[in-house]
C-alpha cells in the first residue's frame, strides 16, 4: 500500500486506504495491517486532512461468515459490531472529530456501499450479499442523524453510480449521496483498463468525474452538498 501511494502521489498528496473484502482472503490476509495504514491495527478509523474530516468503515467480507466460500476463516460479524461502537464513540467525542473547528467537509469511505440494495442471487436463488440489514441501517442512521456527511465514497460493485438518498439503490436510508467509482473494463483485444473517480469539493458543491486509465472523461456531474 505504501509503495502504491508513493507511485501515485509521490509523497505530495495525502492518501487514504480502505480495505476491500478480497483483502481478507489468502494466506497473508491476517498480516495485511503490517503493509497498509491503520489505527492501532484497525482498518477502520477517522482522519483529518486540512478542512476535510473522514471516517473509514470496513464491512469486511460481503457474505455471511458461514458462507462455504470462506472455509470458516473469517469472523466479520463481531468486527462489524465493534464498528458500531466506534461510530458511537466518535459521535460522543464530536468536538474532536467531525465537529472540530475548521472542518468544512465530512466524508464516509467504505469499500462496500453498505446502504445499497444488493439483489444479486446465486444459482439457488439465494441472496448471499444481502447481509447485516439491521446493522447497516443503524450505521446509516447514526451517520445521518449526527455526523451529517456530505458524500460517501465506495467501490466493490464494479460499476459507476451516483446514488442520491431515496434512489432505487437506497434501501437503508442513505445519510448522503453515495458515489461508486470503480469499474474494470476490457478492450476489444482483451486487454484491461480501469475507470475510476475524481471528486472536487467546493463550498456547497462537489464535482464528480468518472475517468478511465487512458485519461478519457466518461461522465461529469455537479452535486449540491
Regions found by a protein language model. Give the residues of each.
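Metal-dependent active-site segment of extracytoplasmic phospho-/sulfohydrolases and closely related
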Residues: 149-157
Amino acid at each position: 500500500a505504501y509503495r502504491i501511494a508513493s507511485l501515485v502521489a509521490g509523497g505530495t498528496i495525502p492518501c487514504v486506504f480502505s480495505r476491500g473484502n478480497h483483502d481478507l482472503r489468502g494466506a497473508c490476509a491476517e498480516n495485511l495491517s503490517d503493509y497498509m495504514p491503520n489505527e492501532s491495527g484497525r482498518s477502520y478509523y477517522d482522519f483529518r486532512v486540512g478542512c476535510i474530516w473522514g471516517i473509514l468503515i470496513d464491512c469486511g467480507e460481503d457474505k455471511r461468515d458461514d458462507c462455504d466460500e470462506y472455509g470458516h476463516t473469517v469472523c466479520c460479524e463481531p468486527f462489524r459490531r465493534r464498528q458500531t461502537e466506534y461510530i458511537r464513540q466518535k459521535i460522543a467525542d464530536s468536538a474532536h472529530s467531525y465537529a472540530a473547528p475548521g472542518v468544512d467537509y465530512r466524508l464516509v469511505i467504505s469499500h462496500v456501499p453498505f446502504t445499497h440494495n444488493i439483489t444479486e442471487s446465486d444459482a439457488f436463488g439465494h441472496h448471499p450479499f444481502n447481509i447485516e440489514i439491521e446493522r447497516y441501517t443503524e450505521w446509516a442512521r447514526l451517520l445521518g442523524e449526527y455526523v451529517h456527511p456530505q458524500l460517501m465514497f465506495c467501490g466493490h460493485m464494479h460499476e459507476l453510480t451516483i446514488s442520491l438518498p431515496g434512489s432505487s439503490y437506497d434501501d437503508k436510508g442513505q445519510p448522503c449521496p453515495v458515489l461508486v467509482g470503480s469499474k474494470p473494463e476490457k478492450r476489444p483485444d482483451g486487454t484491461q483498463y480501469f475507470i475510476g473517480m475524481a471528486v472536487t469539493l467546493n463550498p456547497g458543491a462537489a464535482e464528480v468525474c468518472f475517468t478511465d486509465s487512458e485519461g478519457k472523461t466518461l461522465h461529469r456531474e455537479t452535486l449540491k452538498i
